[in-house]
Amino acid sequence: MAKKAEQVVPEIIDSVEGLNAKMAAMREAQKVFATYTQEQVDKIFFAAASAANKMRIPLAKMAVEETGMGIVEDKVIKNNYAAEYIYNAYKNTKTVGVIEEDKEYGIKKIAEPIGLVAAVIPTTNPTSTAIFKTSSAGSMFHLLT
C-alpha cells in the first residue's frame, strides 16, 4: 500500500526572539552553503525548481483556499512559470567563485553570498511569488527569510 505523504506544517514565528533564533540558525546554514561548489549549488537549484514544479497544483489549491483569492488553474500556471522560468533562465549562470576575469586589468569578480535576504510575499500570489523569490535567491547562493 502506498504511504501517504506527511503534510508539512509551516513553523509560525510570532515573537522577536523566535525570529532572531530562526535567523541565527539560517546564518549557520549559510556558512555551510557558502562552502558549496558550483555543481552542488546547481544540484540544489534543480532539485528546488523540480520540487516546486511538482507541487504546483497542491500549492495553487492551498493558496486559493487560504486567501480566498484567485482561480486554482491560473495559480497552477503561475507556479509552473515561476519554477521553470527561473530555473531555465539561470541554470547555466556561474554563481560560485570567480564569475568574471579581466586579465588585462587584473580584475576578478568573485561571487559570494551576501547573507540572508528578506522578502515580502503578497496574499494575491503567495505561492508563485515564494517560488520565484526562493529560486532566484537560491540560484544566486543566498538564503531567503
Model regions and ranges:
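Conserved small-residue-rich beta-alpha loop and adjacent elements
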Residues: 93-145
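N-terminal Rossmann-like NAD(P)+-binding subdomain of aldehyde/semialdehyde dehydrogenases
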Residues: 1-108
